[in-house]
Regions:
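Glycine-rich phosphate/diphosphate-binding loop of Rossmann-like nucleotide-binding domains
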Residues: 27-32, 36-104, 109
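Short glycine-rich anion-binding loops that position phosphate/pyrophosphate groups of nucleotides
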Residues: 5-6, 74-75, 138-141
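Short, flexible loop segments at boundaries between secondary-structure elements
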Residues: 14-28, 107, 161-176
Length: 198
């Protein structure tokens, strides 16, 4: 059943990144979204992506999500309509899921590096501690995860679909046998999660 799941209007894809940098994310594990579906999300869609990606981090990777809405600006350091969209998405996401730790707008270094986060976004519980990265567009997401995968030698597992009533996932045409194995394991995990939720 590829129909949307209840409460969600759209389908999004996120990438599980297993990096060799344990100082980032949860022991090197990061979840990034949306990397393959929505080219230019509006603020509401970006908020949905943030909430869905956080839920995926919980369900698939066992991560207590610390969500950063990424931008080229940190806490008003730049003014632009794209930044305004991220700020609006943060407000919507906090209303949608007040239980999720989320902040933005944050530059990638402010989201991931504690010293930079403390300098650029003092007082933020997410800055320097993010393990879920929400990018402002598909272009940014797709380029970012592939750069991390290829230049950083990270394992990129996914894309993992969310917002669908049953587990359905996708693989890149450049995937390996190991990638297929990991996606099968994730689909099984998603299926078990659905049965447990009933």
């Amino acid at each position: 059943d590829r129909s949307p799941s209840r409460g969600l209007g759209d389908v999004y894809k996120r990438q599980l990144l297993l990096t060799h940098a344990p100082e980032y994310g949860k022991n090197g594990i990061l979840v990034m979204g949306d990397v393959a579906v929505t080219p230019v999300p509006d603020a509401s869609q970006l908020a949905q992506i943030a909430v869905c990606t956080a839920r995926t981090a919980q369900a698939v990777a066992g991560i207590d999500p610390k969500v950063a809405l990424l931008s080229f600006s940190t806490k008003g350091s730049a003014k632009h309509e794209v930044v305004d969209k991220v700020v609006e998405a943060l407000k919507i996401a906090k209303e949608m899921a007040p239980d999720i730790a989320i902040d933005g707008e944050l530059q990638a270094d402010a989201a991931l590096v504690p010293e930079v986060g403390a300098s650029k976004a003092p007082g933020s519980a997410i800055a320097g501690n993010a393990n879920v990265l929400v990018v402002p567009s598909l272009e940014v997401g797709n380029i970012s995860y592939k750069l991390v995968q290829r230049l950083g030698h990270a394992d990129a597992v996914g894309p993992i679909l969310q917002g669908i009533a049953r587990p359905v996932n996708d693989l890149s045409r450049g995937c390996s046998v190991d990638d297929i194995y990991k996606m099968v394991a994730i689909a099984c995990n998603q299926s078990i999660g659905l049965k447990s939720a009933k």
